[in-house]
A protein has these predicted regions:
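Acidic, metal-binding active-site segment of PIN/NYN-like and related structure-specific nucleases
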Residues: 48-81
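Acidic, PIN/NYN-like endoribonuclease modules and their adjacent C-terminal/linker elements
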Residues: 68-139
């Protein structure tokens, strides 16, 4: 959550609210008991807790913009692939295009936007995914 405060500039109050919402709506996603694994991780020291949590829960991948701190030599022994967000979203889209488009339309509607407007916003964070999606949808 430190990244939300330092990089995005969220206040402690907003960060605490977000964490509370994440815990309430994604209770099964919290990893516990990974702390003892941190010291044995070989990736960048400031991100060892992330790899330790992925190992503990049996994750197949870590999705991050920060691939440089998760070298293949550190993740491959654990069978963990490191992907950027655009790659991960494209993988989900390839698995079930209709569901991904449905969820994007739902997200846009919830935010009072059209799908093209929402995709324009998402393009800032995941340009390769949005470009590919727009090409597929011909929009």
């Amino acid at each position: 959550m430190r990244n939300l405060q330092t990089r995005i500039g969220l206040s402690t109050k907003k960060t605490d609210y977000l964490v509370a919402q994440l815990r309430a709506h994604f209770a099964d996603c919290w990893v516990l008991g990974h702390e003892r694994l941190i010291a044995s991780m070989d990736n960048h020291p400031k991100d060892r807790h992330v790899l330790a949590a992925a190992v503990k829960c049996g994750a197949q991948s870590i999705v991050t913009y920060n691939k440089r701190d998760f070298a293949a030599a550190a993740t491959e022994p654990w069978g963990i692939e490191v992907q950027g967000p655009s790659t991960f979203l494209r993988y989900l889209y390839d698995l079930d295009p209709a569901l991904v488009v449905e969820k994007l339309e739902e997200q846009a509607r919830d935010l009072g936007r059209s799908l093209p407007e929402q995709l324009a916003v998402l393009r800032k964070a995941v340009p390769a995914f949005v470009d590919g999606l727009c090409q597929d949808l011909r929009i």
